[in-house]
Amino acid sequence: MPVKIPDHLPAAGILESENIFVMSETRAANQDIRPMKVLILNLMPNKIETETQLLRLLGNTPLQVDVDLLRIHDKESKHTSIDHMNTFYRDFEDVRHKNYDGLIITGAPLGQIDFEEVTYWDHIREIIDWSQQHVTSVLFLCWAAHAGLYHLYGLNRKILQQKRSGVFVHRRTCQHFPLLRGFDDEFFAPHSRFAEMDIEELKQHPELQVLAESDEAGAYLVLSRNNRNLFVMGHPEYQKSTLNDEYHRDLAQGLNPNVPQNYYRNDDPQADAIARWHSHGSLLVSNWLNYYVYQLTPYDLSDMTAMTPWESQ
């Protein structure tokens, strides 16, 4: 949250140059406050686990957040009871007439399947298109990030020979962006995917900005220049055990997976896993919710034209 300071205080310029969020008394006096309304499109098989992971991050912010859970209507969930889905999830027809402050679209275990071959691809496209007029900011995670970049900007992914799984070091490629406030120069984030985006294509695209990358895992944080779409190529929401669970699931299916890199102590899958990314994940979601949702969204959600983007940097 911002520090409110007197108008024209000399420290303001210094703090802003250090990427510290300050707000003048004049601006603070004109702020209206209400709960943030966030919609989560949950595409992961274990709905309850993913709900918990995302709500854990959203709940660690100082803002009050009202959450709606969204499903693909005609897609059966094999790992979550129909009672749970009918009780807690909405269909798109229930929300298409609404506006939201934020939308989170999760990853999906669709690996090497072409986007056009995904059985519910038309539903994904429809929801993404809808979000560009009805949501202040959209957070795309892992598979959803690739899908969003493909649908919105025509950028396709490259299929990897081996699944990229592990916890990798990342660095900021830009300094003075609200999303990166409080980030260390280097930080860890988990990845679990069968594909990657061409980082040079991302950097050369006039409507996109690469904010963080990894020598081992490639592009990590990509932001659209209108600040509406944030593409996160990894899984900052994962809990400590998730990569381990996925590794043993793949072993049981005879897929001969590589051991997740930089995850187990001494890279020994019989040893304990080390969670190095939780503080980063918490800060990332907090910054997104504060700077790209709360600070930009209109008080009256019926008026999405009232949104005032950050100046492109």
From Swiss-Prot:
Q: Which EC number(s) does UniProt give? A: 2.3.1.46
| GO CC, alphabetical | cytoplasm
Hey, where's the site called Important for acyl-CoA specificity on this chain?
Answer: G111
Q: Which residues bind substrate per the record?
A: K163, S192, R249
Pathway listed for it is: Amino-acid biosynthesis; L-methionine biosynthesis via de novo pathway; O-succinyl-L-homoserine from L-homoserine: step 1/1
- Which keywords does UniProt give here? Acyltransferase, Amino-acid biosynthesis, Cytoplasm, Methionine biosynthesis, Transferase
Site described as Important for substrate specificity, located at: S192
Compartment(s): Cytoplasm
Positions annotated as active site in the UniProt record: C142, H235, E237
Q: What class of enzyme is it?
A: transferase
Question: GO MF terms on file?
Answer: homoserine O-acetyltransferase activity; homoserine O-succinyltransferase activity
GO BP = L-methionine biosynthetic process from homoserine via O-succinyl-L-homoserine and cystathionine
Swiss-Prot/TrEMBL catalytic activity: L-homoserine + succinyl-CoA = O-succinyl-L-homoserine + CoA
User: Which HAMAP family does UniProt cross-reference here?
Assistant: MetA_acyltransf
**What family is this?**
Belongs to the MetA family.
Q: According to its UniProt entry, what is the function of this protein?
A: Transfers a succinyl group from succinyl-CoA to L-homoserine, forming succinyl-L-homoserine.
Protein's name in the database: Homoserine O-succinyltransferase
Species whose genome carries this gene: Shewanella sp. (strain MR-4)
